[in-house]
């Protein structure tokens, strides 16, 4: 009987509590009250989620390295126009971040907010400098894109096909690099001769190598045979060879 009384009392309390929290659907909430109903943390976390997805789209190689193959055939353009576009996007992202009420965020999201703000401010500051004029680099330069392919995980024939498509698109970045460097030289931007000499040497070594020793072909030559039916790997190698020779 005691249990019944407690259970009954609890049920009555819940009924009154629920009734007190209900809002008449016919009542027209003001804009301010509507905004208060929406949890600031939910909106902020949605913002971060959208930022992450956009970042993967903007950095397809990074996405592939994480195992996300949604953008496995894409590359990031290194044209000056793309740098300008990215700078404007960063500024817009910061404006959207500043719209959140920091005080309404929980402790975890306050930390996320600070980190995101630092990241955006650093990226915007870096975008003020024309780094595209100084893209010659002994590591990670236009001549060593094959190293990116070496870091990827190949789990199927399609992964190799995707990399071949990426290589075909990368020809545009090679042309962009040439244009950017020439524009930079006209404006007085250039890397130290120590760097440029080493880069030229690296490029010469690739251009003067036998095709079977070309680092861009290595990925296809060493492809896992189990991913291919009869004749498919040979066809892939032939197409890769034609692409490399044409560039």
PLM regions and their residue ranges:
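N-terminal maturation segment of proteins
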Residues: 22-247
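Bacterial N-terminal signal peptides that target proteins for export
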Residues: 2-9
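C-terminal motif of bacterial Sec signal peptides marking the signal peptidase cleavage site
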Residues: 17-20
């Amino acid at each position: 009987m005691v249990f019944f009384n407690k259970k009954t009392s609890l049920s009555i309390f819940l009924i009154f509590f629920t009734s007190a929290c209900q809002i008449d659907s016919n009542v027209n909430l003001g804009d301010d009250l509507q905004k208060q109903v929406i949890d600031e943390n939910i909106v902020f976390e949605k913002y971060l989620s959208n930022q992450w997805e956009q970042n993967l789209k903007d950095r397809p190689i990074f996405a592939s390295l994480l195992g996300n193959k949604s953008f496995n055939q894409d590359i990031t353009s290194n044209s000056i126009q793309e740098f300008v576009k990215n700078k404007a996007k960063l500024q817009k992202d910061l404006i959207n971040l500043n719209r959140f009420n920091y005080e309404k965020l929980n402790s975890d999201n306050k930390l996320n907010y600070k980190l995101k703000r630092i990241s955006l401010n650093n990226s915007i500051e870096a975008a003020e400098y024309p780094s595209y004029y100084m893209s010659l680099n002994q590591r990670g330069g236009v001549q060593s894109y094959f190293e990116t392919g070496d870091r990827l995980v190949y789990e199927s024939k399609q992964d190799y096909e995707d990399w071949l498509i990426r290589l075909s698109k990368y020809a545009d970045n090679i042309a962009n690099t040439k244009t950017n460097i020439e524009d930079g030289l006209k404006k007085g931007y250039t890397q130290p001769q120590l760097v440029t000499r080493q880069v030229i040497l690296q490029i010469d070594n690739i251009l003067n190598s036998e095709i079977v020793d070309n680092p861009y072909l290595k990925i296809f030559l060493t492809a896992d045979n189990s991913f291919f039916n009869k004749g498919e790997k040979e066809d892939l190698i032939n197409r890769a060879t034609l692409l490399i020779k044409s560039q």
